Structures are given as C-alpha cells and as structure tokens.
Amino acid sequence: MAKEIKFSDSARNLLFEGVRQLHDAVKVTMGPRGRNVLIQKSYGAPSITKDGVSVAKEIELSCPVANMGAQLVKEVASKTADAAGDGTTTATVLAYSIFKEGLRNITAGANPIEVKRGMDKAAEAIINELKKASKKVGGKEEITQVATISANSDHNIGKLIADAMEKVGKDGVITVEEAKGIEDELDVVEGMQFDRGYLSPYFVTNAEKMTAQLDNAYILLTDKKISSMKDILPLLEKTMKEGKPLLIIAEDIEGEALTTLVVNKLRGVLNIAAVKAPGFGDRRKEMLKDIAVLTGGQVISEELGLTLENAEVEFLGKAGRIVIDKDNTTIVDGKGHSHDVKDRVAQIKTQIASTTSDYDKEKLQERLAKLSGGVAVIKVGAASEVEMKEKKDRVDDALSATKAAVEEGIVIGGGAALIRAAQKVHLNLHDDEKVGYEIIMRAIKAPLAQIAINAGYDGGVVVNEVQKHEGHFGFNASNGKYVDMFKEGIIDPLKVERIALQNAVSVSSLLLTTEATVHEIKEEKATPAMPDMGGMGGMGGMGGMM
C-alpha cells in the first residue's frame, strides 16, 4: 500500500491537532467539578465517565497523522494510570500545554534539541522540589483524603479503602469486585486463605454452615499424591497420641486413603480434614513452602529426600485455627517463626521487583499478602450496569493512587504543588535551553487553571492569586475558596505528580523533535459499475406480440 510522508511544520501541526482534540475531550473531567463524558459503545448502552484515561482510550481520529499524535498522548495517560493510578488528566493537560508552547517557539526558529534539553532540566529540578515538599502519609485520615480525591470526591469509597488498608497493611492485597446489591461492602479475610475446599463433605464439623473447623491443629504438607493408607499410617498414629486435629494438604488424596480417613472421622477415631494443595506446577510448590513457613512446618517432598512413611511429628506445621468450606481453606494464627516469615516476605518482594510479567507479579503479590497482611475485598454496589462499571473504575484508580501515596508520600493537591515547586526553581540557562525551561514554567500552571475553569472560575485569575502566596496556600475548587490545602485535606500523592510531569515532558519532547511522519494513504473504495444493458436492444422485436 502507498504511503504518504509529511515533513517538519506540516507534520508537527497535524500531530498537534490530534493532541488538541484528545486534550479537549479529556480536560473537562479534571478536578472536583469536572464534567462527565458520554462514550458510545459498539454494543449495549453508552458509558458515562469522569475518568480521563477511560475517555482517552476511546479516541481514534480519522486523520492518520493527527491520530498518531493522539495515540502518543493516550499512551502517556495509560502509562501514568498504570504506574500511579491517577494523574492521567494532569499528564494529558501538561503534555498539551508543553507541546503547544514548544511548537510556537520551534516554528519561530528555536532548536528542538536545545529546547528539549532545557525542558528536561526544568522538569528534573521541579521534581526535586516536589520531593522536598512532600510528607509521609500520617494515618488513616490522610489515606481517606487521598482515596476520596482520587475517587472523584466520593467520601464513602475513600473510607472503604482506608478501612481496607488499615486492616491488611501496606503489603496486603485489596481487590475490587461487583456487589450483588446496591450497597458498597468491605470483606476482610484474616490469615492465609487459598481456593481449595474439603475433599469430602464428611469432614464437616458445623453442619449448619457446612464448614470444618480445626483448633490447635497439626498440618501435614506434601507435594505427593496419597492413594494408599500405608503411606500416612505411621504419621497418623503419632498425631493421635498427641490428641490434636490434623489437616492434610497434598497434591491429591484418593481411593483407599480418602475412604479410610472419612470412615475414621465418622467413627470419631480421627479429628481430621483433607484438601488439595493450592496452585499448579512450580507455583504449587512455592505456595506449599509459604504455608510451611507460616505454620513452622516442612513440605514432605521426595526432592528433599523426605517420604511420608518416615515423616516425624516435627515436620508438621501448627495453626491456632483452620476453617474449611467447600471452596476455601483459611489458616489463622500460624505458629511459624516471625523471622522465617520476614525472610520469606523479603524473598517474594525481590521476585516482584525483578519479574517483567504482569501475571507473575499479580500472583506474587497475592502470595505476599497471604503471608504478611491479609486480603480485603471491596464490593462495589450500583443500581445499573453502566454506573457499576464507572464506579468500579473509580475505586480501582483510587486504590492505586492511595498505594502511591503510602509509597512516596503526599503533596498539596489541586494543581498547586507544581506551582509551589516551580517557584523555588531558578536555573541559569542560555539560548534555546532557556526557552525549554520557560516552556515548562508556563505549562505547569495549566492543571490549576483547568481545575478552576471546570469549576466555573477564571483560570488565569486563580493561578495569579495562588502564585502571590507561599506554603500550602491553594484553591479549593469545590467551594471557590483559597485555603490551606493540607488542613482542608486537598492532597495528591507525590508519585502521581512526579510521573504525570515526567511522562508529559517525555512525550512532548518526542513530538517536538519529530521531523517527519509516515502513514498509509487511505484508498477510496471504487463505486461498483452498473451492469451492461446492451443486450436489452433485442426487446424491440417484442412489438409483434400486439
């Protein structure tokens, strides 16, 4: 297929048009008074959202060069959301402002490479000032404030996230699911839970709840399939002398072994339950080791030279309480040594840092949570499917932003942090590097101006008023008042501001230093020709029919 090439100003102007259109659609969602955007879907009802990245993801433009510009900035919004959970609209507004200012200067003759260098130096200096101005998240109240702002000022969501983080800790896993009703709920699972239930309902101790509960129990862990009773008989006799319940976690228990266990359980000879080991393949082995560390036991594996026939009671794990239903097993109050658990947690954290697979990272984080904190499930309720999807997106974003705040700290919100940081930056640059520096200094005012405009105020007036002051002074767009942002709880995670600025400068630099674009030429589909009617002339002979 033939391709068209655009050069220099012609290419950059078309790229800018794409960025402008994306920016104009996304910017209206910014701030506490941001507006909704209605998005048509290929099937089903249209979706309504105030989430900038959701709007950006839907945008495809008809002009191929303009579309390339839009797609690059869309990528910035997505990457900002992935890394920090929030700040997608901030990144888009910054990218547009930097590109607009930069394009004006480059068209007037500035050197794009020198301009880029100045922009990079200015951004780095502002980020350093942001870090100096940040403070660690103090407690539950500040976590609630961050989560509330990221959830588009929904205080109920903010409180749920703060409650969840308080209960499972910073290493715990918090997942978001759809509730069956319209109310939001929080479920917290204490201890380690994995998705394997009892192998036989005859192990149940509570017929009403259909659960098996074992108190002060031993836990046998093996990666072997148990099919013969003689494999585990010596160990069963030893545990019977201790008079404690036993949970068997094995690859599988079948045939004679399972039947014998059930019969002895029903006769009251053994207080026992059996479940399959969680996970598959190598992950199963690692999860068995996790349970062993948590309970102070040892995985009986032939790889380690251990067999069930020769296993001793010392190899068994111990737990204060074990609850098993038909789908899940929960181990509470494992008796493992705390230093062993800490070592295992550190090992998993190292694996998380080094893995490149999102799936592996998610599974490792689940294992980390089960060992160190726990698992909380936020169940989001809504009256309609459209509202449910929009609300679930907001909760996901708020959760990521809250984790970012705990990780790197917080700064004043409402677009004021960037202005405060810029006020403290004074770089002695020359020529076109200075032009790049000044571009950033002007562009960082754009987020605050846009928040004010969306709330119905004059952006320029608000920016000037904020610039006159120092410290935590900023603009509360919810009520139009100038306040101490920290005292009012108007805060942003440092990570969100940092990544939004870094990504915006990165994509703007790429666009400003673009000298040519290559795209396919859309071929017009030819209109099908009318069929040849020449053969109809023979119909003249039909006159003889009169």
From Swiss-Prot:
It catalyses: ATP + H2O + a folded polypeptide = ADP + phosphate + an unfolded polypeptide. InterPro entries: Chaperonin_Cpn60_CS, Cpn60/GroEL, Cpn60/GroEL/TCP-1, GroEL-like_apical_dom_sf, GROEL-like_equatorial_sf, TCP-1-like_intermed_sf. Pfam families: Cpn60_TCP1 (PF00118). ATP binds at residues 29-32, 50, 86-90, 414, 492. One of its GO terms (biological process) is protein refolding. Together with its co-chaperonin GroES, plays an essential role in assisting protein folding. The GroEL-GroES system forms a nano-cage that allows encapsulation of the non-native substrate proteins and provides a physical environment optimized to promote and accelerate protein folding. Forms a cylinder of 14 subunits composed of two heptameric rings stacked back-to-back. Interacts with the co-chaperonin GroES. This is Chaperonin GroEL.
